[in-house]
């Protein structure tokens, strides 16, 4: 199995991946632990999942149907208008919000992969977050349903095979381990 960069940052299903990433200038506030946890400041929670895609089933959909699954235009990556976007679209259901309704973000570094000899195609979801609770809320929305009870339609074509949570400490944190 080999991961690779696909065209202009597209997932193997043909859509640009990571379009919801925060701008680089503010990415650290979403991806790195802050003052709320001083022992781990500057580290990050990295959650990695391997998804396989049923490419035959996916390709059986028209571009218009695929766009409704994702919630974006396939070729120009423009988000669909709210009135044409289903409530089960990936970019609707996979969002997380705080108690005041503000959207919470993570940094995604997803990687498409393929193993053609086994007819296996998919995406390694790699998400970095300040708090794992943000990523967890996104996953719960996708798999269990959001507050409105909508599940992520993308999961009709994608199956999570694995999932692992890591804490990625800073170099200073690791250097300090030998001091104790």
Question: Can you annotate each of these PLM segments?
Answer:
Residues 1-180:
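Long, histidine/aromatic-enriched segments associated with O2/redox biology
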């Amino acid at each position: 199995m080999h991961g690779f960069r696909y065209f202009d940052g597209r997932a193997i299903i043909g859509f640009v991946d990571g379009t919801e990433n925060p701008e680089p200038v503010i990415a650290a506030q979403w991806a790195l632990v802050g003052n709320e946890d001083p022992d781990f400041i500057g580290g990050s929670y990295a959650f990695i999942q391997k998804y396989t895609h049923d490419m035959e089933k996916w390709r059986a959909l028209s571009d218009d149907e695929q766009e409704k699954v994702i919630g974006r235009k396939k070729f120009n990556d423009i988000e669909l208008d709210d009135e044409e976007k289903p409530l089960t679209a990936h970019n609707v259901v996979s969002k997380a919000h705080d108690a005041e309704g503000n959207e919470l973000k993570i940094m995604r570094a997803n990687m498409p992969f393929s193993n053609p000899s086994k007819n296996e195609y998919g995406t390694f979801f790699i998400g970095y977050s300040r708090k794992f609770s943000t990523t967890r809320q996104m996953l719960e929305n996708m798999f269990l349903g959001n507050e409105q009870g909508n599940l992520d339609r993308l999961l009709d074509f994608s199956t999570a095979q694995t999932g692992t949570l890591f804490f990625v400490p800073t170099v200073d944190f690791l250097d300090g381990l030998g001091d104790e």
